């Protein structure tokens, strides 16, 4: 009888541990998700492409930074190759030292080009604000807030049809698995660069956000499906999507109808981010978030999963206890890894199929 009482206490402790959900259990879940991501079969995207400014491009076209007339000419080159939208994830926060801002402003005004801005710890706010319709509860306790936003210089900001936030949200271990679709500063909402790409692709002037009592629930561009997010407005990135990559200095293929991301991969200019599938360039995060939203199959963690994990932990602990107390300890030693492997492959099946 004493053994059963002790076993009951052990079961309660294990269930209580799962209910408390300490950080190391969260890390176990994240590492399991990482493995599921790595096990996925890569898939190509037909409507996205990446054009690199790499070391060979710099050698052929000249050192960086280019004057903005040259940047404008390269954007025109991409549209001449058939691009429907060109994404330039670069911050133009200072006037061009060569005085060529007018050339870039003219191109931005005539084309559906998307450029970037960034959050800042300084309180100065030069960011471009986008219209948003909010529904439901107050979003301010949930959306990531920053003291300020650094945007393009006024001449470029006024000419650009789309300006989006370039921001990531690394987890506790420094690995990026999610991307904020919206951030806040000074009581205003700023969409991510991915949201701005979707907005300009749909021809809409604003975006929508729904917030519940437990945080942000969904974001939406009117002509696209609802985008499920976590409580902070983040989207889980699906890294199985791959885009064709070309070099800017080479002859470009037919890019008709494609969203083209102009990316910096030259040594010293590249931005590398740690992800579950290894170190990748920051423009790959933009592509992954776009693909996740456009396909309508973003990764979510339903509210009932915590209850399911708690119930599974309790049932598993109970079965192990009964086996050990009525048979022998080594039967439990065999059963435990079977439970662990089964739970991993069960979660892998749910991740892949649902």
Description of each model-found segment:
Residues 320-354:
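Hydrophobic transmembrane alpha-helices
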Residues 135-142, 232-235, 341:
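A general marker of short, structured functional hotspots
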Residues 239, 263-264, 354:
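Active-site proximal loops enriched in glycine and acidic residues that flank catalytic Cys/His/Asp
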């Amino acid at each position: 009888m004493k053994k059963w009482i002790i076993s009951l206490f052990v079961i309660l402790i294990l269930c209580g541990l799962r209910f408390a959900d300490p950080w190391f259990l969260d890390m176990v879940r994240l590492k399991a998700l990482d493995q599921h991501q790595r096990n996925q079969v890569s898939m190509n995207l037909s409507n996205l492409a990446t054009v690199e400014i790499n070391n060979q491009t710099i050698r052929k076209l000249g050192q960086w930074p280019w004057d903005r007339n040259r940047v404008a000419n390269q954007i025109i080159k991409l549209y001449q190759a058939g691009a429907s939208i060109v994404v330039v994830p670069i911050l133009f926060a200072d006037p061009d030292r060569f005085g060529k801002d007018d050339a870039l402003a003219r191109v931005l005004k005539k084309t559906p080009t998307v450029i970037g801005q960034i959050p800042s710890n300084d309180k100065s706010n030069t960011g471009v604000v986008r219209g948003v319709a909010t529904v439901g509860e107050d979003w301010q306790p949930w959306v990531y807030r920053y003291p300020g936003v650094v945007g393009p210089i006024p001449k470029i900001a006024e000419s650009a049809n789309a300006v989006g936030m370039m921001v990531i949200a690394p987890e506790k271990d420094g690995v990026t698995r999610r991307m904020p679709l919206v951030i806040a500063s000074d009581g205003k909402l700023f969409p991510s660069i991915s949201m701005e790409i979707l907005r300009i692709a749909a021809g809409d002037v604003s975006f929508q956000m729904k917030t519940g009592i437990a945080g942000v629930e969904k974001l939406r561009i009117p002509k696209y499906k609802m985008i499920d997010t976590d409580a902070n407005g983040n989207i889980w990135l699906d890294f199985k999507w791959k885009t064709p990559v070309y070099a800017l200095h080479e002859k470009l293929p037919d890019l008709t109808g494609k969203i083209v991301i102009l990316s910096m991969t030259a040594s010293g200019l590249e931005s590398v981010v740690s992800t579950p599938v290894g170190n990748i360039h920051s423009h790959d995060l933009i592509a992954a978030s776009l693909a996740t939203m456009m396909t309508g199959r973003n990764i979510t963690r339903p509210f009932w999963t915590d209850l399911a994990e708690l119930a599974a932990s309790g049932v598993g602990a109970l079965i192990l206890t009964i086996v050990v107390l009525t048979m022998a300890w080594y039967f439990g030693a065999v059963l435990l890894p079977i439970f662990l492997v089964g739970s991993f492959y069960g979660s892998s099946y749910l991740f892949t199929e649902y």
